[in-house]
């Protein structure tokens, strides 16, 4: 067992069980399906446009504007007003961005950031922490949320059957432990 695997909050026996299972049947090995990056400003206007420029520069993909679901008078937000920008990355772009984003957080993620389906979310407090990004005074400092969606091969098949509502069995869902092992293997992530 590698030194990386010893830094996980999982018993080493369980880690080796998971790795053996993935070796025996490669279709059980989870994979990163997509990475969603979100910058929420809370207001429309010039600041949101600059956030969109920053997100496009970071990801190499054009962001989508997200609208407010309801009016919140205390914050001066109207229903339907653009308040955030987001990008969904897949494939090689997702992995490349994820490497840089994990560098920004020091390859450390809280265990509580993993949901019951094995997906992971974490925040980056300042976008200038991402390697290769320089501070621009006209933009300021922006925080962002990064969500990693992890699934096993075959998960998409059940989701695309619109006529016959599919059910994904519990045994086919990705567990927290598997997510920890996968991210530790791919990126050297430590869970605290």
UniProtKB/Swiss-Prot annotation:
A single GO cellular-component term on record: ribosome
GO terms (BP aspect): translation
TM stretches of this protein: none
Keywords: Ribonucleoprotein, Ribosomal protein, RNA-binding, rRNA-binding, tRNA-binding
Example GO molecular function: structural constituent of ribosome
Domain of life: Archaea
Assembly notes: Part of the 50S ribosomal subunit; contacts the 5S rRNA and probably tRNA. Forms a bridge to the 30S subunit in the 70S ribosome.
Family per similarity comment: Belongs to the universal ribosomal protein uL5 family.
Function in brief: This is one of the proteins that bind and probably mediate the attachment of the 5S RNA into the large ribosomal subunit, where it forms part of the central protuberance. In the 70S ribosome it contacts protein S13 of the 30S subunit (bridge B1b), connecting the 2 subunits; this bridge is implicated in subunit movement. May contact the P site tRNA; the 5S rRNA and some of its associated proteins might help stabilize positioning of ribosome-bound tRNAs.
NCBIfam families for this protein: PRK04219.1
UniProt xrefs under PANTHER family: 60S RIBOSOMAL PROTEIN L11-RELATED
The protein, known as: Large ribosomal subunit protein uL5
Organism lineage string: Archaea, Thermoproteota, Thermoprotei, Desulfurococcales, Desulfurococcaceae
């Amino acid at each position: 067992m590698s030194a990386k695997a010893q830094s996980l909050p999982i018993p080493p026996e369980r880690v080796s069980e998971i790795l053996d299972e993935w070796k025996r049947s490669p279709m059980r090995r989870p994979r990163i399906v997509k990475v969603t990056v979100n910058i929420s400003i809370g207001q429309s206007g010039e600041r949101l446009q600059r956030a969109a420029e920053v997100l496009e520069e970071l990801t190499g993909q054009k962001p989508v504007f997200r609208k407010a679901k309801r009016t919140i008078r205390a914050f001066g937000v109207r229903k339907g007003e653009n308040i955030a920008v987001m990008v969904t990355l897949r494939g090689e772009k997702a992995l490349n961005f994820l490497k840089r984003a994990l560098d920004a957080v020091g390859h450390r993620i809280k265990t509580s950031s993993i949901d019951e389906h094995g997906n992971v979310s974490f925040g980056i407090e300042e976008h200038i922490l991402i390697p290769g990004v320089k501070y621009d005074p006209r933009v300021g400092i922006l925080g962002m949320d990064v969500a990693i969606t992890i699934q096993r091969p075959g998960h998409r098949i059940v989701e695309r059957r619109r006529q016959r509502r599919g059910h994904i069995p519990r045994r086919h869902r990705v567990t927290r432990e598997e997510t920890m092992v996968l991210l530790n293997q791919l990126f050297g992530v430590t869970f605290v």
